[in-house]
């Protein structure tokens, strides 16, 4: 189990409260699919994923990205109990969809990049460290 300090929790919660989940979620999933094209195989029912512009403009990518970031919101509310929080999603993604757990780590890293682009100077090294810790813990839980 990962332990988050009060400062880490505060930094993550504060940043998350300012996040546009719909916008950032679409960007994060879209970037994952562009940068790591082998991840597209899990989204063959999303239609046109033939180019970066097609992926980033795809409404299904945006909708699923929002769903993914909404789940990250659940993680923020339950930082001390991530394994239980993600038990059902873990079962779905690993046991039924056979998603390589490495893909969750990649998505977490992409999300940290999105946070940095959205929050600029507010995304200090301390906030980055806390965010990286959270996305790594979520990847492990999944």
Swiss-Prot record:
**As annotated in Swiss-Prot or TrEMBL, what is the tissue specificity of this protein?**
Red blood cells.
Give a yes or no for keyword Transport in this entry: yes
Please tell me one Gene Ontology term that the record gives under cellular component: haptoglobin-hemoglobin complex
User: Care to name a GO molecular-function term for this sequence?
Assistant: metal ion binding
Alphabetical list of Pfam families matching this protein: Globin
PANTHER family xrefs: HEMOGLOBIN FAMILY MEMBER, HEMOGLOBIN SUBUNIT EPSILON
What's this protein's family per the entry? Answer: Belongs to the globin family.
Protein name per Swiss-Prot or TrEMBL: Hemoglobin subunit epsilon
């Amino acid at each position: 189990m990962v332990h988050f300090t009060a400062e880490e929790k505060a930094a993550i919660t504060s940043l998350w409260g300012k996040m546009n989940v719909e916008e950032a979620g679409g960007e994060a999933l879209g970037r994952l699919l562009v940068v790591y094209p082998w991840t597209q195989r899990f989204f063959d029912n999303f239609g046109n994923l033939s180019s970066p512009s097609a992926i980033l403009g795809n409404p299904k990518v945006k909708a699923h990205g929002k769903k993914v970031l909404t789940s990250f919101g659940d993680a923020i509310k339950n930082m001390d109990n991530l394994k239980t929080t993600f038990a059902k999603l873990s079962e779905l993604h690993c046991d039924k969809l056979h998603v390589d757990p490495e893909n969750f780590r990649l998505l977490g890293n992409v999300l940290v990049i999105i946070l940095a682009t959205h929050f600029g100077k507010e995304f200090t090294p301390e906030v980055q460290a806390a965010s990286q810790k959270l996305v790594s813990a979520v990847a492990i839980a999944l």
